[in-house]
Regions:
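Non-catalytic terminal accessory segments
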Residues: 1-50
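Generic structural motif
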Residues: 10, 17, 62-64, 327
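Hydrophobic alpha-helical transmembrane segments in integral membrane proteins
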Residues: 31, 37-65, 83-90
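Soluble catalytic domains of enzymes that build or remodel membrane lipids, polysaccharides, and related
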Residues: 66-327
Length: 327
């Protein structure tokens, strides 16, 4: 608010000098706008951040096996457990209860469990272990789940900290996908769930490795933390050695073709955390929020549940209930 007031005050002074006026109306305008900004931020911290919605979408895909008609997936993302201190401490319990109440076939977590360090996690082990779905919980790592935001240079310490995060997720009964895939079966039918490591800072992703060995014609659900990586999975790009930006996709077998995922789930952007009249900080980020489709592939980017800075205005936190239907 003080910055807003100062900005308008300087603007008003310039106008006063140019127009030879006697009153700096910028100060009054700055006072009003600054007061509005102050109350908006108070609202975002106290009322906006705790809000959570259950969003339901139906996604139609052409090659879904009959046994998976109506298959229900709950996606949650970016919970940032280090932000739930003090009066916010009850929110993770509410979120997990909401997920379990949906009785999904599969739960998918698309990254950023911690803010900075795995020290934030142990008190939530019992809670996260209570997530229940017929086919379990599958997860990928987000950029905050590595050591990029820690002041650590020793390679052994970095490896140990990252292993703690990975071991924690596995200790909760989650299936952590690190450039790999698993099959989910219903009788003779099956679908595949693949997941990649982080796309940037640090860059550990290998899309082709995650998909290698999946039968052609199979339905594939891909979990990727950062939505802009979705482009690497398009049919026109996925079997090239480099993507459209010239970055190496990372084929392990150059003589093998891999299947393009029909559906990708991502997070990372938090939908900007602040959205006013459709304007949000993340709007210039590719695929920052919502459902997208290109080349027969679909992406859903969720607004997530938390954030390193606990504030939300008009970008409500969410869990997403996805029902798969045959096209």
């Amino acid at each position: 608010p003080q910055f807003v007031f100062s900005l308008f005050s300087v603007f008003g002074w310039c106008c006063m000098r140019l127009l030879h006026g006697h009153r700096n109306w910028g100060k009054l305008l700055g006072l009003v706008v600054g007061a509005v900004a102050f109350f908006c931020f108070i609202y975002g911290f106290t009322e906006g951040f705790p809000k959570m919605q259950v969003k339901r979408i139906t996604i139609y895909v052409p090659n879904l096996p009959k046994s998976f008609e109506g298959y229900r997936i709950v996606q949650f993302s970016d919970i940032h457990l280090g932000s739930y201190y003090g009066w916010r401490g009850h929110l993770p319990q509410r979120d997990i209860d909401s997920i379990n109440a949906e009785k999904p076939d599969l739960i998918c977590f698309t990254g950023d469990l911690q803010n900075v360090t795995p020290d934030e996690l142990p008190e939530y082990q019992a809670l996260l272990s209570s997530l229940k779905a017929r086919d379990g919980v599958m997860s990928v790592l987000g950029n905050h789940d590595y050591t990029y935001y820690m002041d650590v240079d020793d390679e052994q310490e970095i490896a140990a900290l990252e292993k703690r995060m990975q071991d924690f997720q596995r200790s909760c009964g989650w299936r952590l996908l690190m450039n790999e895939h698993v099959a989910v079966h219903r009788g003779a039918d099956s679908i595949y769930v693949a997941g990649t490591e982080n796309y940037d800072k640090p860059k550990r992703t290998n899309v082709r490795k995650a998909l290698y060995g999946i039968r052609p014609g199979s339905f594939v659900l891909m979990l990727q933390h950062i939505p802009k990586q979705w482009r690497e999975t398009w049919p026109s790009i996925i079997n090239k050695e480099k993507d459209e930006d010239g970055d190496v996709i990372g084929p392990d077998r150059k003589d093998s073709l891999v299947v393009a995922p029909q559906l990708t789930l991502s997070g990372h952007t938090h939908a900007g955390q602040v959205s006013v009249l459709g304007l949000r900080p993340s709007m210039f980020t590719p695929y920052d929020y919502g459902l997208f489709e290109e080349e027969g592939c679909q992406l859903y980017t969720t607004s997530g549940l938390g954030g390193t800075v606990p504030i939300r205005i008009g970008a409500t936190a969410e869990i997403v209930v996805i029902t798969l239907k045959r096209k």
